[in-house]
Amino acid sequence: MTKSAELYQKAQQTIPGGVNSPVRAFNGVGGSPIFVERADGAFIFDADGKAYIDYVGSWGPMILGHNHAVIREAVIEAAQRGLSFGAPTEMEIKMAELVSELVPSMEQLRMVSSGTEATMSAIRLARGFTGRDKILKFEGCYHGHADSLLVKAGSGALTLGQPSSPGVPADFAKHTLTATFNDLDSVRELFAANKGEIACIIVEPVAGNMNCIPPVEGFHEGLREICDQEGALLIFDEVMTGFRVALGGAQAHYNIKPDLTTLGKVIGGGMPVGAFGGRKEVMQYIAPTGPVYQAGTLSGNPVAMAAGYACLTLLREEGNEKRLASKTKHLADGFKSLAAQHGIPLVVNQVGGMFGFFFTEQEQITCYEDVTKCDIERFKRFFHLMIDHGVYLAPSAFEASFTSLAHGSKEIEATLEAADRCFAILAAESK
């Protein structure tokens, strides 16, 4: 038995399921999760000392690579001055100014401690600002584990949402409407059936929680137009895409200006940080300047702010955005080409520094229903083959994978060599 397997057994005695976030348990791929001992650059090292080229990157934050020296030193320096004050600091101002400069639609913003907290607060603000209760999300898009957002679609676009987790009251879930991603008609139908009742649309501009699904042409423009016509706010959940799809986020990549934006992951440089912000007139509605309450003891934590500021300062250096996108495209194109050579049907999507692939005969993947038609069992097999070959991909067919600036040509080519061998095994097994 490996040390990771031993630790997993031990963890299950005191931690529900042995993990502190469900996807880490490998339920989506089977087997026991690897327990990580340390990480550096493009690599993670498990409890048995085995190295893996990492394409999870802590689910997105590690855009500069693991254990970056500048971020590490920023954390140490900040920690030496104190871990938490519960009072405002100058670094919070510097951080807010930098984020607003990089993401201009965020005229004002507030720091929180997680992406879930950011989306939860943005939803409350949208409801308070508009005086409306209902929100619209998309099937397959994940926005954290707040009650309003743990809802899936019913049978048909006009069906009221049903809770997808015990503990979410149906009476509460009914205020969440679910449309089909990349389908503007489903959005229009919901607005028509709930005239004057919808406070906001919240959307992952690139859906990263049903793997990696970009918007079809005109989709985000259509959402912007519908919100303007209906008096609803458009919220871009850029927890995953922020600073990764482009330096200014997916909204810069697609040239769309949302009313509110939520951020997480990259903004903390590996520390627990989230943020929400947007138009000044909307943000002024949050306490203490407005009636919508939001607070947090650790919001704007000085150590987390130092890490985030160091990360974004490095990330904005000239050439980094293009370099990240270029190496990710090279990797994605390589996966697609190798799969084709071995006769493996594969759809590969890539935007900026995130990518995903689907084992399917379908020509393209545009929504959650398309994802459910993919060969999940073949993904599981491929995942474990890649693990055996020293490559760590997202352990779920419904999660995107990520590159970092620390992934060099050596790591990319080693990954493609591993993929070549794994596709060959899949092809042989299917004969």
From Swiss-Prot:
Put simply, this protein is called Glutamate-1-semialdehyde 2,1-aminomutase
> Where found?
Cytoplasm
Q: What binding partners and quaternary form does the record give?
A: Homodimer.
Q: State where it is primarily located.
A: cytoplasm
- MF terms (GO), sorted A to Z: glutamate-1-semialdehyde 2,1-aminomutase activity; pyridoxal phosphate binding; transaminase activity
Q: Which Pfam families match?
A: Aminotran_3 (PF00202)
Q: Which UniProt keywords apply?
A: Cytoplasm, Isomerase, Porphyrin biosynthesis, Pyridoxal phosphate
- Does this entry carry the keyword S-adenosyl-L-methionine? no
Q: Which GO terms describe its biological process?
A: protoporphyrinogen IX biosynthetic process
Catalysed reactions listed for this entry: (S)-4-amino-5-oxopentanoate = 5-aminolevulinate
Could you tell me the EC number(s) of this protein? Answer: 5.4.3.8
Q: Which protein family is named in the record?
A: Belongs to the class-III pyridoxal-phosphate-dependent aminotransferase family. HemL subfamily.
Cofactor(s) it depends on: pyridoxal 5'-phosphate
- What GO terms fall under cellular component here? cytoplasm
Which Gene3D superfamilies would you find in this protein's record?
Aspartate Aminotransferase, domain 1, Type I PLP-dependent aspartate aminotransferase-like (Major domain)
> Pathway, per UniProt?
Porphyrin-containing compound metabolism; protoporphyrin-IX biosynthesis; 5-aminolevulinate from L-glutamyl-tRNA(Glu): step 2/2
N6-(pyridoxal phosphate)lysine sites (modified residues): 265
Upper lineage: Bacteria, Pseudomonadati, Pseudomonadota, Gammaproteobacteria, Vibrionales
